[in-house]
Amino acid sequence: IDDIVYRVTTEMGGIPAPLNYEGFPKSVCTSINDQVCHGIPSEDVILQDGDIINVDCSTILNGYFSDSSRMFMIGDVSPEKRKLVEVTKECVELGLKEIKPWSFMGDVGAVVCQHAAENGYTVVREIGGHGCGLEFHEEPWIGYHTKPGTEMLIVPGMTFTIEPMVNAGTERI
């Protein structure tokens, strides 16, 4: 996966943002099964039927950073893993629907956390979404344990990620 991301990113004129960022050794983050985030891809780790994997791609293009994270199911996954992946996607979609000028980041976080909880899951507290643009990680920080009408005001032109880490267990890493 890392080789493909590096090759395609550079062929399209981009730079893989994670590569050498704070010592990170690869071009993409891959987190398998119960690993929360920022996993380091390895040729020694072979994906198995039933695994779930998060692929977190970030690119620098024309001086601007982008960041996108997606979950994938490998082969025949258990009903528990399938539900986790589906609810996580729903959390992202519900969060995105809350984004509009003059709303609040707390609106986004609250709906994400509520949907996860309604389905028996938690959302990690320590890591959240973030702004991206001229820097890899910039303001605002998007937490998911928030209340509607609180946190930063969303204004036109802001760019940020909605990347909730939804867990089947504790809200801690």
Language model features: what each stretch is:
Residues 1-173:
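Active-site neighborhoods and metal-handling regions in enzymes and metal-associated proteins
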